[in-house]
Amino acid sequence: MLKEQLIAEAQKIDASVALDSIFESVNISPEAKETFGTVFEATVKQHAVKLAESHIAKIAEKAEEEVEKNKEEAEEKAEKKIAEQASKFIDHLAKEWLAENKLAVDKGIKAELFESMLGGLKELFVEHNVVVPEESVDVVAEMEEELQEHKEESPRLFEELNMRDAYINYVQREVALSESTKDLTESQKEKVSALVEGMDYSDAFSSKLSAIVEMVKKSNKDESTITESINTPDTEAAGLNFVTEAVEDKAAQGAEDIVSVYAKVASRF
């Protein structure tokens, strides 16, 4: 809208007044004066349009750069905020779950201890022919039943706790991967993801991930250098439409270097 308006204004420039003052003291025919005035006015309008388009292009370019900059800053802040909120939320869930199931977990541990003690008492009674009164048998049966219930509940609780720990590790792993690869290209991110696939989150994950990211960056630089070398033909051989053997040897050597880079990364783990 602004571009069309400026161009339209430039095309409406009236140069006839300035020409009248120029030709005031010159003896020239009206036809020549009109022809010259037409050419002069067309030239002025043409340059005015080009100047307007140039200014509009610069303004648009600056606006796009500002928008892109603001967009990147907003995305970075959003990612950081999401990661912090996710970490806090997961920590809260873990603490809440442990608080809610503390009694059940404690009972499970106590049940195992009680089972061991009860088994030892039974063996002791049998060895020494100790007779247990009938009224005590009911108490023992009730305790065994309660013990069985706790034994059945304990595996479920521990399985749920392990699942929550695994989910926490998964989120922390994804956050670390996202933060480490945010400055990489999409192809570089895919390479890093492929190399860390199967690696579980641990204390050493961050250092291993950093090493892989650096190796991927270096390998991409090597690939760019090799591509430039291959695409640059030999000056003397250009007329014969072929690439020299030296370039082919360099390309082969570069490919071997890239393979060695990934081999070094794999050997670290």
From Swiss-Prot:
Keywords: Viral capsid assembly, Viral release from host cell, Virion
Record GO cellular component, one term: virion component
Family: Belongs to the T4likevirus capsid assembly scaffolding protein family.
Stated name of the protein: Capsid assembly scaffolding protein
Lineage of the species this protein comes from: Viruses, Duplodnaviria, Heunggongvirae, Uroviricota, Caudoviricetes
This protein's encoding gene: 22
